[in-house]
């Protein structure tokens, strides 16, 4: 009868350790989101400093997103094989070091390389932090609460990042924004090393280098083709063909490896899971594309400077942070499928409003930002509703044993959507002259694709259930 005493003592001690571990894990969400959001406001001064065009500037954002998306599954596998705390610390170290490279970059090429290195660090950091949450918080309700706090930090970063970035750019120049990550990274490394226990689960797992290389080639070719299509259509067509061939080989290898694959293909037989992927891609496609194009339009037409643009983005950031906390209750009432797809649809309506008011966002003599601010508020509300609801669908649509893989694929899809959003909407803005017409075409195109994605996600997930349990998703 005395055997249970030790577990009870450990259970008493565990919450204290968890309370110390959660801030370290939340810092990971903060620095990854800040490192993404803060750069959007710096595109115009970076372009001025290096004398470059929009197409090249897109790589300052896409290099991070692309490296993150391509390496995310490998980052999660490294944590499973060699230790999640070790992967977390390594990711924070790489991300902090990359920030130093970006801050000191003498050329745009070095800056882009530093951004890619930062994306690689985030690809280690984020899946490791999610896996640590799953290991430390074993009770579903407690784990859900911890993940909710973890996710809310992304909303806080969306408020702090642009505002802080605008202030720093105005006071100290664009290089200063990359220094923000460094102290947070050091704090995360120190706190995680002190309070987070090591864990690993290497059973039945191994690297899939061929699939990883093919995936990188496929994504890289298609994204580069999207950015470069206007300037060299023949090369863009060749890149798209190469990417398609890489995708075909990737699928063939993964099908042969079965459950040992980098991406087990049988996951995609689950309709709810497929719908979640569509919703996540549509969500970040429009959101990240808009956050690249709109601040660039404001600043390049001298409607707002960097600090003014950061304040003008608050109508998006504040609703996102506030709605995120209540998205679980909304999803419980109407279903995660409806809440997630509805949030993406709201974002699409927000982009449409920004497109309608494009003339006021690009006229320095008579600026009128009411349409843009209303659109940003809709976008932020939809984003806050969609993020948590789509994540809940990811966890609920598959067996618990595959929840980690599902979460990694969810983040891959988000970042791929972001890459294509920045590439395509930025290319449309540039191709249409970069003025009011460019902003209007980019935003209305993004709106149409988001609304279509929301409808497709809702329809695809309509009959989805968790594998092995006939449970409706929404």
PLM segments and residue spans:
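Intrinsic disorder in cytosolic terminal tails and internal cytosolic loops
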Residues: 1-17, 459-474
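Hydrophobic alpha-helical interface/terminus motif in multipass membrane transporters
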Residues: 43-46, 132-133, 168, 196, ...
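Membrane-helix interface residues
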Residues: 52, 82-83, 138-141, 171-172, ...
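Hydrophobic core positions of alpha-helical segments in small-molecule transporters
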Residues: 60-63, 90-91, 113-114, 126, ...
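Generic alpha-helical transmembrane segments of integral inner-membrane proteins
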Residues: 66, 70, 93, 97-101, ...
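Hydrophobic transmembrane-helix bundles of small-molecule transporters
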Residues: 148, 170-279, 286, 304-305, ...
